[in-house]
Amino acid sequence: MNNILQLNPQQKHLDLLEPITGLPTISSSPVKFVNNFGQLITDPKRKVITTTTSDDIINVVKKDFTFENNQPDDIVRLSEATILQSGINLKGTTRHCQISPNGSKMFIQYTIPEHTIDIGNGDETQFQILFYNSYDGTWCFTVRAGAIRMACLNGQVHADDLSMFKSKHTPSINPDHARRKMVEAIKTFEAEGERWSRWKDQSATNRQAFDCFAEAAGCKFVLSSEDMSIYDLLQHKNVYTNRSFMYMWNQYTTHEQKYLGSNEWAIYNALTHWSTHAPAGRKTNVNNELTTTVRRQESVRGAIATRLAA
């Protein structure tokens, strides 16, 4: 397999990437417990999953669960093989890898500047391929298309989710499947660019923005109080204590609306600024911050599907 990849002319671009170091190793051990008689018992049907970076037990699984070819370094190699097999130009590609402190989740993001959309006045968005994997059952191995707006480094959320690949078991991707899915992903990315351009020309009222942020933040009080003014709503405890909603509203009124205008593109960028940059809640476990980001992206997807023009 390595010899095949070395023959790929795009390999030279991946060779320029900084290596990902310090990856944990996943291991397992038998489940043991003390019964009512004080005896130490081994459960023959279960085992616990741990990593070399933490003493945490990150999952309890059936005995036949395997992480053969599913170690974090395997996922990195698979991510490289996948984008090589996809047939796209990888010149200038960058990579970002994030792993939760206890090793239970990992995320790899490739940004591919050879596929860039300019939606006007130099406002550029670059194509991304995202790889997700977890060992605590949060999500299965997933490959998804994404994008990043270069002006603010917001991770763009596609209105139509494009999961290129999912697997609950040992990950592997057929080269033909990778190429086919990449063609679909780039077409979707280009279609999203056309949608974003339309949003720049689609004017929006403050109330439309307010309701869209409430949808993403799960602020039901706003959505059920159409007769109340924005001013009155902002005085209500159910609104001003919703940190996600207030983050988006403040981002919109103090930045996006000021620089982009009162339009759906500005609303969208306030949404993606929240999903990309907003801090996790005070009670959020540090090992669940990656989960929070993905959950926010799904909330944004739902809001734009119901509140912004197609």
What are these regions (language model features)?
Residues 70-81, 103-107, 126:
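Short, well-structured alpha-helical interface segments that form or flank functional binding sites
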Residues 1-77, 87:
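Feature for intrinsically disordered/low-complexity regulatory segments and propeptides
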Residues 58, 83, 146-150:
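Generic hydrophobic segment detector
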Residues 55, 84-89, 117-125:
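Intrinsically disordered, low-complexity coil segments
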